[in-house]
Curated annotation (Swiss-Prot):
Protein name, per record: ATP-dependent Clp protease adapter protein ClpS
Organism: Yersinia enterocolitica serotype O:8 / biotype 1B (strain NCTC 13174 / 8081)
InterPro entries, alphabetized: ClpS, ClpS_core, Ribosomal_bL12_C/ClpS-like
GO annotation (BP), single: protein catabolic process
Highest taxon listed in the record's lineage: Bacteria
Pfam families to which the protein is assigned, alphabetical: ClpS (PF02617)
Family: Belongs to the ClpS family.
Summary of the function given for this chain in its UniProt record: Involved in the modulation of the specificity of the ClpAP-mediated ATP-dependent protein degradation.
Subunit description: Binds to the N-terminal domain of the chaperone ClpA.
Coiled-coil positions: none
Length: 106
């Protein structure tokens, strides 16, 4: 007579008795790029509004954008980075500024 408890054996559900480890998500840098037309005050506003920087840090990053051509605003998962880029670019266009926010793999 067979075992009545065979249905309790879950080993067949685990491939080779190994549990796959979860990989950390891919991360992306959100970057503000310099242009010759967007006012510095607007860049500071963007950094405070979308990245929650205080005035000192926002000013420092704005100066990096101005003098170095770009600055990393933060590193995020793909979905968060894409959303931030879209929101910043939309906000810039709504305010008629050519400010460009991009992302690249970290």
């Amino acid at each position: 007579m067979g075992k009545n408890n065979d249905w309790l054996n879950f080993e067949h559900l685990v491939k080779d008795k190994q549990i796959e480890a979860l990989k950390p998500p891919s991360m992306y840098k959100v970057i503000l790029n310099n242009d010759d037309y967007t006012p510095m005050e607007f860049v500071i506003d963007v950094l405070q509004k979308f990245f929650s920087y205080d005035i000192e840090r926002a000013t420092q990053l704005m100066l990096n954008v101005h003098y170095q051509g770009k600055a990393i605003c933060g590193v995020f998962t793909a979905e968060v980075a894409e959303t931030k880029v879209a929101h910043v670019n939309q906000y810039a266009r709504e305010n008629e500024h050519p400010l460009l926010c991009t992302l690249e793999k970290a």
